[in-house]
Amino acid sequence: MKNYYLIALIISFSFSFAQTETEIRAIKSNLDLDVLEQVSFEEIQNEIAREKRVTKFLMLNPSIERIEYSGNTIQRIYDIIEGTPIYQSTDNAEAAIGTRTNFIQVGGDMNLNLEGENMRISIWEVGGKTQSTHVEFNDTGESRIEFGDSGNDVTFHSTHVSGTLVAAGINEDAKGMAPKATLGSYTTNSVFSPLSTEIISNALLLSNHSYGVPVIGNNGTAPTWLMGAYNNDARSWDNLLHAAPTHLAVFSAGNSGNDQYSGGLADGFDKLVGEKNSKNTLTVANASSVNLGSEGQVLFGLVNMNSSSSRGPTDDGRVKPDITGMGTNIFSTGVGSDTAYGPATGTSMSAPNVAGSILLLQELYNDTNNQYMLAATAKALVCGTASDGGVNGPDATYGWGLMNSKKAAETILGEASESSLISEQSLLNGESLVFDVTACGSVDLVSAIPW
């Protein structure tokens, strides 16, 4: 079995880009096409089985609607477990500042001028797609939003998430993390098959998934065993991403932080469901505010967490969520007109803050190394360079901390001066790899090893 490891040794102290056919072929060479096809087929069978269970339940309960709308929140019956409907629920300048992404964007202090040009990210959303006609997506004369499946319904949620990712900055306060990237807009009616197609056809590096199963849905509390469990949804995502090691799926942690239920691991914790507990996904929590110094350092050693952000850990003790982004009162694109904007709060907003920032880090890594990071490398880079949110070290609230795009970019650039090391290696059972490093003593020596 081949495992890939990253060693990122982090010492604290204008590029151009085009994704070429050669680069796309290099990404595709890492894919296990047979396994991708098999996982997609299995998930299609799971989708058919879920649809049968939901259809039968709705026939027996005609007063219950499959999709319900409450303000900007959408809840859709996803499955029936133990006779109970399981709901799937919808979970930019301030966001960029919080994760220090403004340092690596155009005009940032690092003079990197990263914009995500000629790069792509796709999103899956409950209930509808992105308003592609919005001015923020039409700055080039044609929309940078591409619809990947059928259906014409647009939603505020999808449009807001898309803006956080790729809004051009016509309104500077609503500028997205990667304002020149293109975006594929899908609904969650089907995920694995179109995602696999995107990965194979477009060498897709990143996807954003701001949805999930809440602890308390329209029909009450989800079965207690679901919270923190490594269930079939989590396993399916791990299988898919193992076959596509270049692709990182970013998930919102959920907004069940204030919900109470009996039988959890600890009061206030154990509120992550399904794919949020997958090993290979990146699960994002929601910070409400942070005080930063001029160099992007966290002042007073505290990142304020939004109380609604769902906490881990997983039932088997792994650190989840993985990372924290800014998702409180985020100003982004809206619906109703092509110049509509508005604020929104939730891990649905912090996830695209993180996903779009990682897209820029992939752009930078390719500029400096002529290749893109594997998903595990990108994940370790983000987690290994994050700013502690409260207590030192990882925890079930912040994960590894608040994303620090500036520190991550410095780590990529630091390889040239040997102040950092990013290494992707294959390691067989029983083998060992040895890296000799020298710590200067005045700053922390940090390592992150994923597989």
Task: Give the residues covered by each predicted segment.
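N-terminal domain-start motif of subtilase-like serine proteases
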Residues: R25-I123, E146-V154, D238-H242, L265-D267, ...
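Catalytic-core environment of secreted peptidases
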Residues: W124, K129-D139, A287-P352
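Short amphipathic, basic-aromatic surface patches that mediate peripheral association
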Residues: V446-W451
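Hydrolase catalytic cores
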Residues: T324-N392
